[in-house]
C-alpha cells in the first residue's frame, strides 16, 4: 500500500514541502531562520487573537483596556508580554534572515527575494500600526510623526495624510482603522509566506558554498526537522526569558502614560527595530528628502540582485566582500544607536555619515569589490 502522505492531495503538499523535500546536505544554522520566522508568525497571530478578544479600539478606552488585559484577564500579562517581545524576536530573525540572504547570494533567486522584500515591508507596516494600539504617549506621537510624512508628497500629500487619519489629526478614526489593519495584515503575510515558499521550492535552497547542490541532497525530515527544532528551542527560550524576566526592557517608558495630544515627549522614537530607518530619515534636513531616503533604505534590497558583479555567488570565498558585509552590519548597528539618540551634535553628523556609508557600501563598494575579486582570481600567466 502506498504511503498516505504521498497520495492524499493535502498531505502530498505538506510531504513535498517539509518531509521528502530534497535539501542541500551542507546548509548551516543560518538556514534555520526561515522556519523560526514561521513560528514567530504563528505565535504573533495566536497571542494577537487572544489580545483582540479583550482590546477596545477607542481612544477613550484603548489604554485602560490594555491595563485591564494585564491586570484582570487570566494570564493576560503573559499574552501581552509574549506578543510585544515576540515582535522583537520576529524582527531579530528577519534581519538575520535577510543578512544571510545577502552574505550567501540567495538574492539571485529573484522571485523568492522580491516576495521576501514585500514580506519585510508588510511586517514593518503591521508592527507600526500595532505599536499605535495601546494608545500611550509614544504610540500617539509615533503615529503622528510617521503619518505626517505623507504630507511631504507634493500636491496630494496633505489630502493623503487626512485620508489615512480619517480626520484632521491622529484621532479615534485613526485608531479604529489601525486596529483593522493590524488584524488583517498577519493573514496577508501568511498568504505571502506561502507564495515565498512556492517560489523557493521551484529552485530549491541555496547553500553556504553557493555551488549548485543538486548532486548532494538529503531529505528534509529527519535531518533538518531536528536541526530546526534546536533553533526553535533557542528561540522559545530567549522569548520566554525576555517576556518573563525583562518584559519592558525593549519598550519605551513614555508608553506607560496615556496619549496626550497637548504634551509632546522629549524624544519621539519608534521601537528598536525601526531605529536604523528612522536615523536615515532624520539625517536629511529636508522633509521630502528624508522620506525618500527612508523608502530607499528598504527598497534598495530590490536592486541588490542587479548589483551582483562577482563570478562567485556566495561570499564564503570572497574576503574583501566579507569585510564590506561586516562593515555594513556595524554601520546598521551604528544607525540603530543614532536613531535612539536626541537630535544634537555629535549624533547628527554621525547619523549623516552612517547614512551615506550605508548607501555607498551597497551601491558602490560591494559591486566594485566583486569586480576586483573577479580580477584577482583571473590567471595571470
From Swiss-Prot:
<feature type="binding site" description="axial binding residue">
    <location>
        <position position="196"/>
    </location>
    <ligand>
        <name>heme b b566</name>
    </ligand>
</feature>
<comment type="function">
    <text>Component of the ubiquinol-cytochrome c reductase complex (complex III or cytochrome b-c1 complex) that is part of the mitochondrial respiratory chain. The b-c1 complex mediates electron transfer from ubiquinol to cytochrome c. Contributes to the generation of a proton gradient across the mitochondrial membrane that is then used for ATP synthesis.</text>
</comment>
<keyword id="KW-0408">Iron</keyword>
<feature type="binding site" description="axial binding residue">
    <location>
        <position position="83"/>
    </location>
    <ligand>
        <name>heme b b562</name>
    </ligand>
</feature>
<dbReference type="GO" id="GO:0045275">
    <property type="term" value="C:respiratory chain complex III"/>
</dbReference>
<feature type="transmembrane region" description="Helical">
    <location>
        <begin position="226"/>
        <end position="246"/>
    </location>
</feature>
<feature type="binding site" description="axial binding residue">
    <location>
        <position position="182"/>
    </location>
    <ligand>
        <name>heme b b562</name>
    </ligand>
</feature>
<dbReference type="GO" id="GO:0005743">
    <property type="term" value="C:mitochondrial inner membrane"/>
</dbReference>
<feature type="transmembrane region" description="Helical">
    <location>
        <begin position="178"/>
        <end position="198"/>
    </location>
</feature>
<dbReference type="Pfam" id="PF00033">
    <property type="entry name" value="Cytochrome_B"/>
</dbReference>
<keyword id="KW-1133">Transmembrane helix</keyword>
<keyword id="KW-0830">Ubiquinone</keyword>
<dbReference type="InterPro" id="IPR027387">
    <property type="entry name" value="Cytb/b6-like_sf"/>
</dbReference>
<dbReference type="InterPro" id="IPR005797">
    <property type="entry name" value="Cyt_b/b6_N"/>
</dbReference>
<dbReference type="InterPro" id="IPR048259">
    <property type="entry name" value="Cytochrome_b_N_euk/bac"/>
</dbReference>
<dbReference type="GO" id="GO:0008121">
    <property type="term" value="F:ubiquinol-cytochrome-c reductase activity"/>
</dbReference>
<feature type="transmembrane region" description="Helical">
    <location>
        <begin position="347"/>
        <end position="367"/>
    </location>
</feature>
<protein>
    <recommendedName>
        <fullName>Cytochrome b</fullName>
    </recommendedName>
</protein>
<keyword id="KW-0679">Respiratory chain</keyword>
<dbReference type="InterPro" id="IPR005798">
    <property type="entry name" value="Cyt_b/b6_C"/>
</dbReference>
<dbReference type="InterPro" id="IPR016174">
    <property type="entry name" value="Di-haem_cyt_TM"/>
</dbReference>
<comment type="subunit">
    <text>The cytochrome bc1 complex contains 11 subunits: 3 respiratory subunits (MT-CYB, CYC1 and UQCRFS1), 2 core proteins (UQCRC1 and UQCRC2) and 6 low-molecular weight proteins (UQCRH/QCR6, UQCRB/QCR7, UQCRQ/QCR8, UQCR10/QCR9, UQCR11/QCR10 and a cleavage product of UQCRFS1). This cytochrome bc1 complex then forms a dimer.</text>
</comment>
<keyword id="KW-0496">Mitochondrion</keyword>
<keyword id="KW-0999">Mitochondrion inner membrane</keyword>
<feature type="transmembrane region" description="Helical">
    <location>
        <begin position="320"/>
        <end position="340"/>
    </location>
</feature>
<keyword id="KW-0249">Electron transport</keyword>
<comment type="similarity">
    <text>Belongs to the cytochrome b family.</text>
</comment>
<keyword id="KW-0472">Membrane</keyword>
<dbReference type="InterPro" id="IPR030689">
    <property type="entry name" value="Cytochrome_b"/>
</dbReference>
<feature type="binding site" description="axial binding residue">
    <location>
        <position position="97"/>
    </location>
    <ligand>
        <name>heme b b566</name>
    </ligand>
</feature>
<keyword id="KW-0349">Heme</keyword>
<keyword id="KW-0813">Transport</keyword>
<dbReference type="GO" id="GO:0006122">
    <property type="term" value="P:mitochondrial electron transport, ubiquinol to cytochrome c"/>
</dbReference>
<feature type="transmembrane region" description="Helical">
    <location>
        <begin position="33"/>
        <end position="53"/>
    </location>
</feature>
<dbReference type="InterPro" id="IPR036150">
    <property type="entry name" value="Cyt_b/b6_C_sf"/>
</dbReference>
<dbReference type="InterPro" id="IPR048260">
    <property type="entry name" value="Cytochrome_b_C_euk/bac"/>
</dbReference>
<feature type="transmembrane region" description="Helical">
    <location>
        <begin position="113"/>
        <end position="133"/>
    </location>
</feature>
<keyword id="KW-0479">Metal-binding</keyword>
<dbReference type="Pfam" id="PF00032">
    <property type="entry name" value="Cytochrom_B_C"/>
</dbReference>
<feature type="transmembrane region" description="Helical">
    <location>
        <begin position="288"/>
        <end position="308"/>
    </location>
</feature>
<dbReference type="GO" id="GO:0046872">
    <property type="term" value="F:metal ion binding"/>
</dbReference>
<keyword id="KW-0812">Transmembrane</keyword>
Amino acid at each position: 500500500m502506498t504511503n498516505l502522505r504521498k497520495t492524499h492531495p493535502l498531505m502530498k503538499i505538506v510531504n513535498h514541502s517539509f518531509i521528502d523535500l530534497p535539501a542541500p546536505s551542507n546548509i548551516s544554522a543560518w538556514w534555520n531562520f526561515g522556519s523560526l520566522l514561521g513560528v514567530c508568525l504563528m505565535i504573533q497571530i495566536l497571542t494577537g487573537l487572544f489580545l483582540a478578544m479583550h482590546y477596545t479600539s477607542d481612544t477613550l478606552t484603548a489604554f485602560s483596556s490594555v491595563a485591564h488585559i494585564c491586570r484582570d484577564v487570566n494570564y493576560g500579562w503573559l499574552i501581552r508580554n509574549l506578543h510585544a517581545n515576540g515582535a522583537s524576536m520576529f524582527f531579530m530573525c528577519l534581519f538575520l534572515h535577510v543578512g544571510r540572504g545577502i552574505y550567501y547570494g540567495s538574492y539571485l533567486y529573484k522571485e523568492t527575494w522580491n516576495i521576501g522584500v514585500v514580506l519585510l515591508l508588510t511586517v514593518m507596516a503591521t508592527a507600526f500600526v500595532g505599536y499605535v494600539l495601546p494608545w500611550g504617549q509614544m504610540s500617539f506621537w509615533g503615529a503622528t510623526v510617521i503619518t505626517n510624512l505623507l504630507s511631504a508628497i507634493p500636491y496630494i500629500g496633505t489630502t493623503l495624510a487626512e485620508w489615512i487619519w480619517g480626520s484632521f489629526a491622529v484621532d479615534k478614526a485613526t485608531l479604529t482603522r489601525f486596529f483593522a489593519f493590524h488584524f488583517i495584515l498577519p493573514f496577508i503575510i501568511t498568504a505571502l509566506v506561502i507564495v515565498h515558499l512556492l517560489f523557493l521550492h521551484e529552485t530549491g535552497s541555496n547553500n553556504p558554498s553557493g555551488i549548485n547542490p543538486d548532486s548532494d541532497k538529503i531529505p528534509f525530515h529527519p535531518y533538518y526537522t531536528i536541526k530546526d527544532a534546536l533553533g526553535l528551542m533557542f528561540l522559545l527560550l530567549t522569548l520566554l526569558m525576555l517576556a518573563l524576566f525583562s518584559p519592558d526592557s525593549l519598550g519605551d517608558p513614555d508608553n506607560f502614560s496615556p496619549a496626550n495630544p497637548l504634551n509632546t515627549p522629549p524624544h519621539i522614537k519608534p521601537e528598536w527595530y525601526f531605529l536604523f530607518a528612522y536615523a536615515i530619515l532624520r539625517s536629511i534636513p529636508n522633509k521630502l528628502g528624508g522620506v525618500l531616503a527612508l523608502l530607499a533604505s528598504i527598497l534598495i534590497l530590490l536592486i541588490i540582485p542587479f548589483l551582483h558583479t562577482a563570478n562567485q555567488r556566495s561570499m564564503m570565498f570572497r574576503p574583501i566582500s566579507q569585510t564590506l558585509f561586516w562593515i555594513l552590519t556595524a554601520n546598521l548597528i551604528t544607525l540603530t544607536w543614532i536613531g535612539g539618540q536626541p537630535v544634537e551634535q555629535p549624533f547628527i553628523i554621525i547619523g549623516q555619515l552612517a547614512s551615506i556609508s550605508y548607501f555607498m557600501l551597497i551601491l558602490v563598494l560591494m559591486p566594485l569589490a566583486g569586480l576586483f575579486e573577479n580580477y584577482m582570481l583571473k590567471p595571470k600567466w
